[in-house]
Each structure stands twice: as C-alpha cells, then as structure tokens.
Amino acid sequence: MLGYSYLCRMNTFNKVLRSSLLLAVIVLVLFFGLYIAYSTNAQIQPKDYYKYTMIICCFILVPLFAGFSFFTTLSVSRAKAKIATTYEELLTFKDAFKIGFYTMFIAGVISLAVIFIFFNTSGEWAQDALRNGILDTFMGNMDAEQAKVIEQSRKEPEIMKVNLFSFKYFFGLLSMFLSFYMAVSAIFAQFLKKRVY
C-alpha cells in the first residue's frame, strides 16, 4: 500500500509539473511573440504595446491559468476516482487545492522570473516603451489639466528612470498573483473534491 501511495503522488507530481511547464512556455511564447512583433513593426506605438500587454494579461492569461489549473485537477481527480475503492481514497479538498495552486504557482514563478530577468538585462528599451505607453494611456484618459501634469512628469528623470521590473515590483505582482491562484484553486478544489465519475 505504501508503494501504491508513493506512485500516485509521483504521477500527480508529474502531471502538475508537465502542466506547469507547458503553461510557462505558452506564457513566454505570448510575451516574446508580442515583444518581437513590437520590435520589428514600426507601426506599433508604445501606447499600443502597453495596451496589447494588458489585453494579453487580462483576457488571455487569466483564463489560461484557470483552465490549466482546472484541467490538471480534473485529470488527477478522474484518475483517483478510477482506482479508488473507498470514499476516503477520492481526491480531497486539500489535495485538489495543492494541485491547482502548484500548477499555477510553478508556471507563474517561472514565467514571471524570466520576464523580469529579460526586462532587467536586454529589454530595457521595451521597459521604456511600456513606461511611455502607461503615461500615454493615462494622458489619453484624463482631462487636459491633468494631462499637462503627467506630461511634465516625463521630464523628471527620477520618474522616467523608475525600474518597473525591480524586486519590489516582482514580489508585489507575485503577491497579487498568489491571491488569484489561491482563490481559483479553492473554487476548483471545492468543486472537484470527492467526485466520482
């Protein structure tokens, strides 16, 4: 029985790791695809680069992370239900939560770390484009008086040299993502616990 339990945990770990790595690769392909499109197409302005980045983050990555989490947890839940002989052997809330959370956490940390390392090494000009895109977006959505204040801030070196991809922002962004990962994992764990197929 001990060997069986060990094999089940290893199979679960392998599924989580495979899903996480695939998810991280998809995120990085989206990120570098947009970066390459921006760097090779002169018609894309910094404001558009920022806008496309936000669209990808909000409308593609959120459902992608949730979908990977759900289907990984569902896959493990079905596998456990198929071989379970008692009710106690079915997937528990705790195990389902771990599976969903680890799938998103591993992929999120890998992709976020690669993106932050990239922006701090060879992508500094893209960071400038994002910063200008943020300011252009703010200026486009404000009245003329506030837009002038933002335009003046572009001339201040301490504002324009703020590193958007420092450790401070990395951990701030990661903490926001962790709260999303926990909420999504809890919902899916509640839905998939002790499920029989």
Placement of each model-derived feature along the sequence:
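C-terminal halves and exits of single transmembrane alpha-helices
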Residues: 96-119
